[in-house]
């Protein structure tokens, strides 16, 4: 996702603020990263127990509040890709 100039660190802090709730909602892996080459770009990599767990997490009050707080700091440019995880280090079996 792309942030408006100067808001990357605020968005990263918001994204990292709900880790415990994500785990309880069925998130196995949640990684937030930034790019030195593109200072307004934030990457989020998530692995969920299922699509249903992810969809349910978006309905949680704390998730809705974080999204509402972040939206004014974002440009609206999002990309995403859904994968079927075959395995790897750090991925639950």
Where in the sequence are the language-model features?
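Short, histidine-centered active-site or binding-site loop motifs used for metal coordination
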Residues: 1-3, 48-49, 84
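Short, surface-exposed ligand-recognition loops at beta-strand->loop->(often short) alpha-helix junctions
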Residues: 2-12
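Residue-level signal for secondary-structure boundary sites
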Residues: 7-9, 52, 88
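An amphipathic, aromatic/His-enriched active-site/gating alpha helix that lines ligand/cofactor pockets
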Residues: 17-29, 47-81
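A short beta-turn/loop motif at secondary-structure boundaries
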Residues: 33-38
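Short glycine-/small-residue motifs
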Residues: 41
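Short, low-order "capping/linker" segments at domain edges
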Residues: 83-93
């Amino acid at each position: 996702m792309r942030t408006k100039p100067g808001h990357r660190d605020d968005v990263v802090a918001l994204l990292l603020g709900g880790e415990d709730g994500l785990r309880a909602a069925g998130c196995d892996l949640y990684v937030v990263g930034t790019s030195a080459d593109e200072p307004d770009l934030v990457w989020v990599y998530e692995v969920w127990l299922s699509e249903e767990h992810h969809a349910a997490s978006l309905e949680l009050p704390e998730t809705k509040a974080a999204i509402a707080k972040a939206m004014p700091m974002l440009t609206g440019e999002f990309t995403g890709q859904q994968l079927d995880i075959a395995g790897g280090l750090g991925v639950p079996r």
